[in-house]
Amino acid sequence: MPPPDSNPGSFRDHLKHDNKNNNSSTTSKGKQRYTPLHDSIPEEIASPRSASASSSFDLDPDLENQSRNDYKLRPLARSSSTNGGHNYSTAYIPVIRDEGDDVETYLDSITEAEQELLSLSKQYDFADDSDDFDSDDDAALRRKVQKQEQRRRRERLKAKVWTPVKYARIWRRTLVVVIVALALLVWGFLRFTAAQRQGPKVWPMLPSDSWFPSPKGGTLKHWEESYRKAQSLVRNMTLIEKVNITTGTGWQMGMCVGNTGPAELVKFPSLCLQDGPQGLRYADHVTAFPAGITTGSTWNRTLMRERGIAMGREARLKGVNVLLGPSIGPIGMMPAGGRNWEGFGSDPVLQGVAAAETIRGIQSNGVMATAKHFLMNEQEHFRQPFEWGISTALSSNVGDRALHEVFAWPFAESIRADVASVMCSYQMVNNSHACENSKLLNGILKDELGFQGFVQSDWLAQRSGINSALGGLDMSMPGDGLHWTDGKSLWGRELTRAVLNTSIPMERLNDMVTRIVAAWYQFEQDEWERPPPEGNGGPNFSSWTGGDVGWLHAGSNDGLYAVVNQYIDAQGTGPEAHSIIARKVAAEGTVLLKNVDHTLPLSRNASGPSGVMRVGIYGDDAGPAQGPNACPDRGCNQGTLATGWGSGTVDFPYLVSPLEALETAWKTEVEMTAFLRNAVMPADVADKDLCLVFANADSGEGFISAGGIHGDRNDLFLQKGGDTLIRTVASHCGEGQGKTVVVIHAVGPVVMESWIDLPGVHAVLLANLPGQESGNALMDVLFGDVDASGRLPYTIGKSLEEYGTEAQVLYEPNAPVPQVDLLDALFIDYRHFDQYNITPRFEFGFGLSYTTFKLKDLHVRSLQSKSRSPAARPAAAVSPPEYNTTLPDPALALFPPGFQPVYKYIYPYLPSLDGTAPANYSYYPKDYNQTQGPSPAGGGAGGNPALFQEMASVSVQVQNTGDRKGQEVVQVYVSFPSDEKVKIDFPERVLRNFTKVELEPGERREVQMTLSRKDLSYWSVREQNWVMPDGDFQIWVGRSSRDLPLQAKY
């Protein structure tokens, strides 16, 4: 989704390369990166070696490093008879300079390939620097000599006999060929045996499978009443009203970022859809909550839900019908992915639990939540063609097993939590656009997972009209088609026309609108106050202006204005203030990674060797800089980092910086000096007793480029010189006698190898993205007001390469349609490290505490007898609504007489009856006429209800063995048995449950968790169902993915 002032204009037909040389933008191995067409914030330094529309060849890098005096390359000019000018054919070939007079000796010394190159070079004019001053006679004489030399060389080569040198050369080449051939044979054999061993190791579906027709909603019992009400309403709607509900009115054509048209005859209102995952975007008097990645770091289910409740409450008070969050795609397959911070962590169970709790919290207020982005939106590069100047968005190619076990798992949990809406993503999946991918939307989401709500597109993610409707899309957002704010929708009047001419069945349109209306009833929004003119309901803020009066249609020039901002304070007050939950989440989401000699927590009654404690604060991440809202959608890295950038952000009502909080943190007098810059001298730290150094790493959505980062990070290092800053401070703090505490604010994992083991680094806190209460929450942990109880939601490796080849962002197009192949996506994050026996710096789930805990007495008890397959899919509890599908008179779809349309506003009306006559449409998607049977894995919300039967209980004793209150996160991992019937690879172990428990010193408590059938199953591609393998499962219980002291069999 673009910034509010986005104006795409015409697309540039060239690419530019960014070679800015600084710590934040330097690319891996010095490679240039493909950069987007939008301008960078701040402005990037453009490379002089931009690739233009004209054809040219770049110099070889090694050749470029040579002196220009050694080589001179001259193209031949060929006259053009058409325009009198010249067309140039350019080739760069180094000029061969004579090092002596023995030309024949030289020719003998070069390879046959070089001889052939010389013979072909006669079409070019090679010259050294002095050639520009040669006379015509000299040039003619030189050409004559060259021809004679070439003739003699050819004769000499014909007469040349074999020599021992020739034989040696042939044997060497033959040996190389044999070695390469043997290596290929060995490689092929190993690949074959690995494939045999893994059995259903799934290769990408290229192209994506098809699944038609789109399943109807209204088949689950707990949605029955809502669908009954929706049926009564939809039955009385006109075709125009149905289309109006399914199509947005256009970008900036309403108060919210997304607005649907109303159905006025049946009194169904326009719906307001608003970002997002961190709070209400573009709204006043709302809370800037900690980001999703910080929430995931709490591993606290209660806080996850409380945060969701507060977000839903604010959306309700602001008149928002649909909140566009939580974000659970990307899941973090690529650690440098730009939007990973919006989600909760790089594990499907952690992501799924956090998503479900957030959704339940949001929807407890009657606000519809949105699970996004479905599916495989793992990187920002090439997600949209118009952002990058390519013809088509990239394709994320993934196998069926990884799709189910990793990427779709959190969405299944969201549907079990009754999420009202699912947003499809920008890119393609297995070479079919996600918002028209019938296998994903119809087959997996609506049939297998039993989704009863509506599917909406990401903003401009819809890339077709008919195919997207048939493929399972229910709502087009924001209504615009292929370009922003041009008033040309792929639906709107085009959907009206397609239904009338039978290209799209009326039955499909009825299901689309029924799903939307049923969700509206499911969360009792029919009881909300009616919007004007009947009441004072609807959105009470404008996304496009901060003034009380503004345009009603900011994307048009119609001149209509009204009071658009009522400044309703939605943040809560007193003990109900949402800042309280924001501070709790930020504090519990802070992860203690290192703590030498109990450096932390700090004492508020501090003193130094000389009496007064001398404290130094280092790094611009400690201070407020220009303020939290200095850049649109937080699209710059300045001051303390409290959020990433993009549509998932929020306008901060305030931001407490670490420096502001530190100024009032100590009870005794301290001498505190702040150096709010990332370049300090040793003298700046030499006289300090305590050095607090702050550094960060930022990223965000692909429509913004900031600091040389085009959405996705270029690497995993700290930005703006943060690593150098830490090394300098840690090496010189107190002339080696002081203590250095490092605080990191980051969107994801950062590589710490250059400083983590320095003796001067005594403690490290990863504060993630803490939101508006950043400084206050940090003080709570830094001074021990609360325990350090955060745990890593991802693995911190020692290098980006350790995460594997498939975890790397594709920075350069590798095909006209960029292809990202995720063949080993099953082994995401810590699973990859386990699979290849790589020791990370800090493993998934890791985090230190200010106290100590002991786990003991693990018991695993069987609750159900094992069976390979779940019970059969149950029959639908209720039948979906049925309607009369008779087409109306096309004349009723024309603009009403005297109607004055708003410029660029998207209407369902037709300007004429052209194209409305029923016709035989012949461009349907592949296999459209083949009806698919129901999936055996379906039958309920989130899948077959049998998958969620509890198979085993896990109990363990947890004791606080320290001297202060603290919280422990108990994590349960499962290792699958080796099924001899179907040989298949499993991850070493996978997270399957967790709980967080708070204990007083010496307190002991038993905690219990359960494992479901799905927890103990894998997705069988052959059977298209979840299968429990035969044999004993190993159950591990501990504190992280690699600290698992207890184990038992099941």
Swiss-Prot record:
Reaction(s) catalysed by this chain's protein:
Hydrolysis of terminal, non-reducing beta-D-glucosyl residues with release of beta-D-glucose
What Gene3D superfamilies does its record include?
Glycoside hydrolase family 3 C-terminal domain, Glycoside hydrolase, family 3, N-terminal domain, Immunoglobulins
Look up the record and report any one GO term of the cellular component aspect: plasma membrane
Q: Where is the active site?
A: D458
Q: Write out the pathway annotation from the protein's UniProt entry.
A: Glycan metabolism; cellulose degradation
Protein known as: Probable beta-glucosidase E
Q: Topology versus the membrane, per the UniProt entry?
A: Single-pass type II membrane protein
Q: Where is the composition biased (Low complexity)?
A: 47-56
Q: Which residues lie on this side of the membrane: Cytoplasmic?
A: 1-174
**Keyword terms:** Carbohydrate metabolism, Cell membrane, Cellulose degradation, Glycoprotein, Glycosidase, Hydrolase, Membrane, Polysaccharide degradation, Signal-anchor, Transmembrane, Transmembrane helix
Q: What InterPro entries does the record point to?
A: Cellulose_deg_GH3, Fn3-like, Glyco_hydro_3_C, Glyco_hydro_3_C_sf, Glyco_hydro_3_N, Glyco_hydro_3_N_sf, Glycoside_hydrolase_SF, Ig-like_fold
Q: Provide the residue span(s) of the region labelled Disordered.
A: 1-87
Q: Which residues cross the membrane?
A: 175-195
